[in-house]
């Protein structure tokens, strides 16, 4: 029996190789994405892709007629059973409001794509219609190497890469990376886009959008969260090894300090990490220090520490990462009482040599925003350089 099970698993592993058209069945629509699987003997590797943006599975395991895809960065899994040329199962992820379980299916072959039609391509000013008011957003659609792609931009950064297809007057773009589950679907009605933004299994938010004209409807990222600048910025949290790290430790005295409030569950934080590491490595010899404050899902120290270690190793982060709390925005904000209006992960805090906050940047513009991403990375460097040029205060902060 054991031998036959091992043989079956080996045959299944080999047969899984190739491209798969995958989907999550949400309450109000279908989120499409691509899975690519490679086999080397019975060992499998693969990627989950939205257009040209791909996330590598940490492991793919086969047992009998079942396959388990793991995305350890986000504590997420896809488990499915092979039925002919189809996979049927569930996506699971543990969120701060409890586990998410969403039906999953896939069939062999390439995912259909289309170019960005002229009526859709470009920038749109959108309103997400809520029960307590409207929320401004910006939609950007363009032609990419893999067809129609785009992003959504809010006050605290972008929603990363979306990809999909469009017909004569309708469109649907998806974003799924193992953590966030997004579907943007709509139709052109006259000169207006109307549709629904889906987040997770059930959440649905109607939207309207018009061609972008005039000033942006969004706040500047530096105007979202305010800080008390009258006293030195204070923090005291433990690192993944249990060592207490505090703002008044000798390593920070008289230094420029950048504090990154992040979460390993946050794809935008993953996009920001390489830029922060590059900034640290180039300016650390000049007097820059950095600290990451991790706000995680589980609240279990051992579980959260393991995820933060994985995040640290993934990006080769050389500065301390501290366990600061859970990712509930209100609870996280309470751990940083000098900030007012904390709303976003990541939030980047720039602190001068005197220990006082000089700027707070909510969110991050990732590569999906194109030129905005490059401009933001350059802005971070300019802010640090201005602070480094200031004299070290006598006696320290």
What spans do the regions from the language model cover?
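Central antiparallel beta-sheet cores of small beta-barrel/beta-sandwich binding domains
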Residues: 15-82, 91, 98-100, 114-188
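Structural micro-motif
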Residues: 316-320, 337-349
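N-proximal helix/coil linker or "cap" segments that precede and/or mark the start of modular domains
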Residues: 198-238, 250-254
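Short active-site neighborhood of thiol/selenol oxidoreductases, capturing the structured segment around
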Residues: 246-270, 276, 290
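Structural microenvironment flanking redox-active thiols in thiol-disulfide oxidoreductases
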Residues: 271-316, 328-335
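Thiol-/selenol-based redox modules, centered on thioredoxin-like
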Residues: 344-397
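A short beta-strand-turn-helix
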Residues: 235-257, 280-283
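A short acidic/small-residue loop/turn micro-motif
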Residues: 95, 201, 252, 364-367
